[in-house]
Design a protein with these regions (language model features):
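Compact, glycine-rich, soluble single-domain proteins
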Residues: 7-53, 57
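C-terminal structural segments of small proteins and small subunits
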Residues: 51-84
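Intrinsic-disorder/low-complexity, polar/charged segments enriched in Ser/Thr/Lys/Arg/Asp/Glu/Gln
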Residues: 1-5, 60-62
Length: 84
């Protein structure tokens, strides 16, 4: 299992387009990916769940991946969020 914290940098937060990109990235990997905000976990491959986070600029979220390609999944998710 790999787990990292990430501070949202996008001015508009994790809104529809970046959330969609985030989910598409998570779907590319076999690992189970979860995103947490305020201790509550959401399936990273579900656009509805990611939008439910309500993550805005400055929020710190936690990314967790578990499986055979967990490190690659985390790296790709961070890269996707950075492009936001």
């Amino acid at each position: 299992m790999v787990e990292v914290s990430y501070k949202i940098k996008n001015e508009e937060g994790l809104h529809a387009r970046p959330a969609s990109d985030f989910c598409k990235t998570a779907e590319r990997f076999k690992s189970d990916s979860t995103v947490f905000k305020d201790g509550e976990g959401f399936e990273a491959k579900s656009i509805l769940m990611v939008l439910c986070l309500g993550a805005v600029k400055g929020d710190v979220i936690k990314l967790r991946a578990e499986g055979e390609d967990e490190q690659q999944a985390i790296d790709a998710l961070i890269e996707t969020l950075d492009k936001g």
